[in-house]
């Protein structure tokens, strides 16, 4: 069983040498890295022509405020 695992590890290391470098979103840097990744993904979604776009908030209607008990 150990020998089979060793072969798989060696094969995966050989394949990884030919790949392009991975993009680092900072996910391995803890909480601040996760926040940075979420920020960058949000910017990408807001600027994507097929994406949801920027959040637009409706204006507050004064009548709704006045009717509040």
From Swiss-Prot:
Expressed by the venom gland. Residues 1-21 form the signal peptide. Residues 46-69 are annotated as: Disordered. GO terms for molecular function: diuretic hormone activity; G protein-coupled receptor binding; toxin activity. Keywords: Secreted, Signal, Toxin. It is found in: Secreted. It comes from the Eukaryota. Residues 60-69 have a biased composition (Basic and acidic residues). Belongs to the scoloptoxin-21 family. This is U-scoloptoxin(21)-Sm2a. It comes from Scolopendra morsitans.
């Amino acid at each position: 069983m150990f020998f089979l695992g060793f072969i798989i590890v060696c094969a995966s290391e050989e394949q990884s040498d030919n790949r392009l470098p991975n993009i680092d979103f900072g996910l391995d840097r803890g909480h601040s890295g996760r926040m940075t990744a979420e920020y960058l993904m949000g910017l990408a979604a807001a600027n994507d022509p097929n994406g949801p776009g920027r959040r637009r908030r409706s204006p507050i209607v004064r009548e709704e405020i006045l009717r509040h008990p």
